[in-house]
Amino acid sequence: EYFAGVAKYDFGSIVKKLDDKSSFGFSFIRFGVDNIPNTTELIDAQGNINYDRITYFSAADLAFIGSYGKKVNDYLSVGGSVKIINRKAGDFAKAWGFGVDISSTYKKNDWGIAIVAKDVTSTFNVWNYELSNEMINTFNSTGNELPENGLELTLPRVILGVFKNYEFEKNVHLLIEFNSDITTDGRRNVLISGNPFSIDPHIGAEFNIRDLVFLRGGFGNIQKTPDLTGKMIYTIQPNLGLGINIKGVEIEYALTDIGDASIAEYSNIFSSTINLNPE
């Protein structure tokens, strides 16, 4: 659950090795907010408020993703994904979209660098609205602009990362990573804000004990926000995580925004992975 339970993020995937150097996967993602009150018919024809006329709907994004990855040599790996996106808000707004992501990782000794280019061709979403006569009348009477069918573009984003692995003793490791999101859609409220490029840095670490227990922590979402006096200050979002791997079954938990340090609400994230051919 994201943002103190307001939104729900569901993810599932299956991955199959094609050979010793390549694999293919299929993933499904749903991110949505459910039980949103629809008050467009709250007031009846006589001008009376009738709460029984309130209905509820969901606003959700669905993604169907096919991915392929290949190990080029002992140091370099490359991969890519094709995604089909379905977005909807109740029965009155729907969109279909298409996008492509590519990535590459280079590792040598205990160092590594990685790059992910998301929405490299820009992701296209074609919106179609089907409003009832009651909704159109409500929009007009309240001075709201009627939505129009159109095309939504998600511009490319590049994620650059560098990581270092430290080995303290046999099967005990510490991995430290620094990465940055580079967006291309104009000025954003991030640490380095510009037009058209903005840079949002993150740092994280994972303590690995015998590939059985994983302790994780990190910082990100650095933003400039007003405090109680109206003075602009920088806020940062701390996150913690725990992972357990037992005989090919991995259980992961993460808690974001520890102590409500940033302007965002906290999120609880659970995931599990089953390896059908554990080594």
Short names for language-model regions:
Residues 1-279:
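Subset of outer-membrane beta-barrel
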